[in-house]
Amino acid sequence: MTDAPSEIDGMTVFNTHNVDATKQPMFFGAPLGVQRYDQQKYPVFEKLTQQMLSYFWRPEEVSLQKDRSDYQTLNDTQKHIFTSNLKYQILLDSVQGRGPGMAFGPYCSLPELESAMTIWECMEMIHSRSYTYIIKNVYPDPSEVLDHIVDNQKILDRAKSVTSAYDEFLNAAAEWGQSNLWKPGWRDHINSEWTSKDLKRKLYRAVANVNILEGIRFYVSFACSFAFAELKLMEGSAKIISFIARDENQHLVLTQHIIKKWQEGDDPEMKEIVEEEKENTIEMFKKCVDEEKEWAQYLFKDGSILGLNDRLLSQYVEWIANKRMHALGYDPIYDQSLRNNPLPWTQHWISSKGLQVAPQETEVESYLIGGLKQDVKKDTFSGFKL
């Protein structure tokens, strides 16, 4: 194997030199060449790719005929909650529908991680298409919703928190992509306005921000959708949202593994950065929780729906935040036990195995495409008789 080729100027779509990807860091190594998946530095990313592919679905598989008539029966408060959440979810998945590929993909050094992020971005696009599908089937004029997403200041305020870390990294990474800074001899060059560690710090903050987005920011909206369905309202939409929730959990796990690999020393410099950014990361969690609580108050400003209000949602967001922080090795900071879900009835919507439906009635969430058990041995069926 040879080192990164010095004759490559800037980025390349295909590295023609032999680079051992199993010895590369996850990001900012040599450009990728052959997409080979027979060997992986981190098999967990290949496993996540297979898992996400097995969950593939399309919104058109779910009938929304009843949802159209259900929506007409909702009062103004319920319509405000349903529509506002749709608008915000569209914004989040518009960001995630292009963010991973646009920001992280160009600087990825492992084929198995590149593959996982490609599927991740594809599924986010399906989520965005799903919201359009819901809107087209529920509202007489879809433009009344879609044309006014960026007119809502509450949504724009949250959008800034979601996109700022992405944008800061994208702008800083431009010099890397347009130069030879990925080469060891060019890093930290005197002509560079920043060091490679500065750039990696922005990458960490972007990934940490996405981890929080995937793990917390959707869940107020999810809970509201499931609350309607518990009342036998907007059940088709809730079914689609449950597919999305299942996917987002996979994306959350992907970002958790990226951060954990950094913590374990995938890149020694990133390991230092993760430790240095601990307090800042905790502040990012706090800011997200505060914003989600404010969003819950905005949703329920004119009243509640049966089984759900802004107080319960605030407790739910704190509980989720504690879980997400614990998964990254941080101590929980909110007075919510990890064992006690404030909204236990949401769990069977988020866990696809908890939903029992007849195949002819709706899309079955627990059905996996291409799911194979590959640990069959010679004597596995020795006790079987025909």
Enumerate the language-model features and the residues they cover.
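Non-heme di-metal
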Residues: 2-386
